[in-house]
């Protein structure tokens, strides 16, 4: 089974995270940041991934370190769980509506980290979550996993709905990208490696 478990401990955070690419039955998220827990749960459910996250961070300052470090560990686990990348689609994309909002995510498991994030988040805070941390999370995942990730909010008026559409689209796009494809021999690249 393609899976990984890692721990990251710094003076700011302690993150314990497990990711299962082929078994989406067990999802449990506790980061101390309620809205972020909700988004990670949506990502896992809509991507059909198993995800267990336990995080302790300096949320008395703000949620930045917790959100970013969870992104780093998730990216590291994704990279380790995929290891050879043989037989996977490599590419994935998804449009996801959430009421009046529409989110889009495209992924290339390329071995090259790059991110493009576009979208206006008009409400600066949702509960204890600074909405600008949405981009920081995706940036951390992309860099740690060495993937190319494009995330775009096409339109919408409710900030919660916009971010929710992105996290669901991220799950669905990543599911497509990591899916095994019987028609692909080796890695899906003319270079012979990713």
From Swiss-Prot:
Its EC number is 4.2.1.19. It catalyses: D-erythro-1-(imidazol-4-yl)glycerol 3-phosphate = 3-(imidazol-4-yl)-2-oxopropyl phosphate + H2O. It comes from the Bacteria. Coiled coil: none annotated. InterPro entries: IGPD_sf, ImidazoleglycerolP_deHydtase, ImidazoleglycerP_deHydtase_CS, Ribosomal_Su5_D2-typ_SF. GO terms for biological process: L-histidine biosynthetic process. It is an enzyme of class 4 (lyase). One of its GO terms (molecular function) is imidazoleglycerol-phosphate dehydratase activity. Pathway: Amino-acid biosynthesis; L-histidine biosynthesis; L-histidine from 5-phospho-alpha-D-ribose 1-diphosphate: step 6/9. Keywords: Amino-acid biosynthesis, Cytoplasm, Histidine biosynthesis, Lyase. It comes from Bacillus cereus (strain AH187). Belongs to the imidazoleglycerol-phosphate dehydratase family. The keyword Amino-acid biosynthesis applies. SUPFAM superfamilies: Ribosomal protein S5 domain 2-like. One of its GO terms (cellular component) is cytoplasm. It is found in: Cytoplasm. This is Imidazoleglycerol-phosphate dehydratase. NCBIfam families: PRK00951.1-2, PRK00951.2-1, PRK00951.2-4. The lineage of its organism: Bacteria, Bacillati, Bacillota, Bacilli, Bacillales. Transmembrane segments: none annotated.
């Amino acid at each position: 089974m393609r899976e990984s478990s890692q721990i990251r401990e710094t003076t700011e955070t302690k993150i314990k995270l497990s990711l299962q690419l082929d078994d989406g039955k067990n999802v449990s998220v506790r980061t101390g940041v309620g809205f972020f827990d909700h988004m990670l749960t949506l990502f896992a459910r809509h991507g059909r991934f198993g995800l267990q996250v336990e995080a302790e961070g300096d949320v008395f300052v703000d949620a930045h370190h917790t959100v970013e470090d969870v992104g780093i560990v998730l990216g590291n686990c994704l990279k380790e769980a995929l290891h050879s990348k043989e037989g996977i689609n490599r590419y994935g994309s998804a449009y996801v509506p959430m009421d009046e909002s529409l989110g889009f995510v495209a992924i290339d498991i390329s071995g090259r980290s790059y991110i493009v994030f576009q979208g206006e988040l008009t409400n600066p805070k949702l509960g204890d979550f600074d909405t600008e941390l949405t981009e920081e999370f995706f940036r951390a995942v992309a860099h740690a996993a060495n993937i190319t990730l494009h995330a775009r909010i096409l339109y919408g008026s409710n900030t919660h709905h916009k971010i929710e559409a992105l996290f669901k689209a991220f799950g669905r796009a990543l599911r497509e990208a990591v899916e095994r494809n019987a028609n692909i021999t080796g890695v899906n690249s003319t270079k012979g490696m990713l």
